[in-house]
Amino acid sequence: GGYVSMYKGNNVFIQKLLIFINMIILPVIIVLAWHFATSTGAMSTLILPKISTVLETLKEQLGNGTLTGDIGISLSRIAKGYALAVVVGILLGVLMGMNKFANRFFMLTFTAIRQIPMIAWVPILIIWFGIGEESKVAVIFLAAYFPVLVNTVSGIERTDPKLIEVGKMYHLNCWQQFTKIYLPSALPSIFVGLKLGLSVSWMAVVGAEMIAATSGIGFRINDARSLMQYPVVFAGIIAIAVVGVIMDLAISLIGKLCTPWEKGR
């Protein structure tokens, strides 16, 4: 028994190690190609700084609090816009998923609005809300709202009709049907929407800050670009990527914890 459990434990460890190696192969290749291009002179360090210079800049900006301050400002904007998008998107998504009249009423208009690129909303929102926080929060809301809404509607609509019939047989009221049948069925799809919405909102806030802001990681990158401080630009890009990956992993973990019945699928 002891040898069997030890073998299984080692086997699981090896599988996880292979998965990890598989995941980091491409990033390692990119870093090596970057180093090769700058060290051999294949690319000018004026347009592509050496990776050692970028890492030194990253260390310096983390040390003096510049980078953490910028990221903190951007994340605070996301917290407001994303939270609002999640609440409105899920509530309206549930309504549209469970009510055909509501679905027909909203869907055409929402589909049309979804086709408008986020970047096109920025000047309009600046006109409406000014260059302050409200315009950035509105951009984030619009970016995150539709992925959450669409995936919530999809999850509700894909609920097994047999389960709905069972609910009717047991005379479950509307709230009981929602909590015991529709919600468990829709949660995996809802979390897909939450994940997509968070990813898009992170990109949206960076883009909005580049166009109309005096603070945040997007502003810092654009400001450094105008001053030709390219190591700062690349340090900011790396920070954006790292924070984005952390947020993606966090929402994936929360999704797995909230939908344990999906583990075996």
Which ranges hold each PLM region?
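Loop-to-helix entry region at the N-terminal start of transmembrane alpha-helices
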Residues: 69-77, 127-148, 186, 191, ...
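Transmembrane alpha-helices
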Residues: 138, 142, 175-207, 235, ...
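Short cytoplasmic-facing helical segments at TM-TM junctions of multi-pass membrane proteins
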Residues: 155-193, 221
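Periplasmic/extracellular loop-to-transmembrane helix junction in inner-membrane transport proteins
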Residues: 10, 16, 40-83
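Cytoplasmic-entry segments and transmembrane alpha-helices of multi-pass inner-membrane transporters
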Residues: 91-127, 140, 150-154, 165
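Hydrophobic alpha-helical transmembrane segments of multipass integral membrane proteins
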Residues: 25, 30, 68, 72-96, ...
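N-terminal signal-anchor/first transmembrane alpha helix
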Residues: 7-38
